[in-house]
């Protein structure tokens, strides 16, 4: 990775805005695209310039322990979809499409720390042009102009609704976690 994932992720968690456009160059080698936080877990999404200038998408999972964020893992893949124009709702068929996702085991702790169990799950979303924000359970996530978003959770996939500029619901978004056979299910 050509950037410090922890430092850049913490910047997003502290309120730094994601990039408005997903454009890389020889000078701009990585861009923050999206962030979501659910209590003591978070996921961040970045676009980076890979070998030969090919865009790559990176998602990092983080956990807050004793007031300090740490990265646990994540995933990556082709990022060329992020550099394309946003699809229209009529073409996408939904306010957003869950294109990929994954999971990372939570910290097991040490004898000094309380043991945490379970997983941190995330879903990568491609959001329709008409959608300006997502309601993720009780959270509100603005969607940047490039239309990439990430959603994080620890138990059941959240209820996600696409919202337009007036705040009206455009419709539900089905979350398909990595390895799922059915929308909204894990495993």
Annotate the PLM regions.
Residues 116-122, 128-187:
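Ser/Thr-rich low-complexity repeats and stalk/linker segments
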Residues 29-32, 45-49, 113-118, 127-132:
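Short loop/turn and low-complexity linker motifs enriched in small/turn-promoting residues
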Residues 2-22, 41-114:
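A general sequence property marking short-to-moderate contiguous segments
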Residues 35-42, 49-52, 62-68, 127-130, ...:
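Short, solvent-exposed coil/turn segments at beta-strand boundaries
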Residues 21-30:
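A short, amphipathic edge element
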């Amino acid at each position: 990775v050509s950037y410090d994932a922890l430092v850049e992720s913490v910047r997003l968690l502290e309120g730094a805005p994601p990039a408005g456009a997903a454009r890389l160059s020889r000078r701009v080698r990585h861009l923050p695209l999206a962030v979501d936080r659910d209590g003591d877990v978070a996921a961040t999404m970045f676009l980076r310039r890979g070998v030969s200038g090919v865009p790559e998408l990176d998602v990092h999972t983080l956990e807050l322990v004793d007031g300090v964020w740490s990265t646990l893992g994540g995933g990556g893949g082709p990022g060329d979809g992020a550099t394309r124009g946003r699809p229209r709702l009529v073409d996408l068929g939904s306010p957003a499409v869950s294109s990929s996702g994954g999971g990372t085991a939570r910290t097991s702790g040490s004898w000094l720390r309380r043991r945490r169990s379970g997983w941190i799950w995330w879903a990568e979303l491609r959001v329709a042009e008409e959608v300006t924000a997502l309601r993720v359970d009780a959270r509100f996530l603005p969607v940047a102009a490039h239309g990439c978003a990430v959603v994080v959770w620890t138990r059941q996939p959240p209820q996600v609704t696409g919202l337009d500029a007036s705040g009206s619901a455009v419709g539900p978004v089905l979350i398909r976690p990595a390895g799922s056979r059915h929308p909204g299910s894990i495993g």
